[in-house]
Amino acid sequence: MNIAVYPGSFDPITNGHLDIIKRASQVFDKVVVGILVNPDKKGLFSIEEREKLISRVVKDMPNVEVRSFSGLLVDFMKEENIKVIIKGLRAMSDFEYEFQMALMNKKLNPDIETLFMMTCAQYSYLSSSSIKQVAMFGGCIKGLVPDEIIEDICKKSNNK
């Protein structure tokens, strides 16, 4: 079985993330959306909330699973028998950072490959950080995140 992991914090998931997930799910037998647990970072949503939100968004994609992990991505991949990392790229600045990470992951486990997928132009400006900021100030996030989670983001942002 050809399995890939799409790792990230997804706080919150954006339409750019969802676009990569959809496209990757057409290439791989299974895609695992891997939510990184970073205890040093206080997110808008808890890990459990992110798992639920993403699961709701991908519920109609039978070959997509949502899991959280802590520690090194390569260790998670070894446990799950995954050999491919999917990374979305919005701009050259993303590539420089992700290229360094790909080299580090390859050094830690030579069996791992990183595949880069270009974000569709319509989503190239999106980031979870910008979504949180727009929502916090009461701006419209329709079209930026999946419709199923707009209300969750707005409620959570207004409670901050």
UniProtKB/Swiss-Prot annotation:
Pathway: Cofactor biosynthesis; coenzyme A biosynthesis; CoA from (R)-pantothenate: step 4/5
GO molecular function: ATP binding; pantetheine-phosphate adenylyltransferase activity
Positions of substrate binding: 9, 41, 73, 87
Gene Ontology CC entries for this record: cytoplasm
Main location: cytoplasm
Cell location: Cytoplasm
Keyword Nucleotidyltransferase: yes
Listed cofactors: Mg(2+)
Highest taxon of source: Bacteria
Sites annotated Transition state stabilizer: 17
Reactions mediated catalytically: (R)-4'-phosphopantetheine + ATP + H(+) = 3'-dephospho-CoA + diphosphate
Keywords assigned: ATP-binding, Coenzyme A biosynthesis, Cytoplasm, Magnesium, Nucleotide-binding, Nucleotidyltransferase, Transferase
Known EC number: 2.7.7.3
InterPro entries cross-referenced by the UniProt entry: Cyt_trans-like, PPAT, Rossmann-like_a/b/a_fold
Record keyword Repeat present: no
Residues holding ATP: 9-10, 17, 88-90, 98, 123-129
SUPFAM superfamilies recorded: Nucleotidylyl transferase
GO biological process: coenzyme A biosynthetic process
Family label: Belongs to the bacterial CoaD family.
Quaternary structure, from the entry: Homohexamer.
Biological role: Reversibly transfers an adenylyl group from ATP to 4'-phosphopantetheine, yielding dephospho-CoA (dPCoA) and pyrophosphate.
HAMAP family, sorted: PPAT_bact
UniProt-recorded name of the protein: Phosphopantetheine adenylyltransferase
Name of the gene this protein is made from: coaD
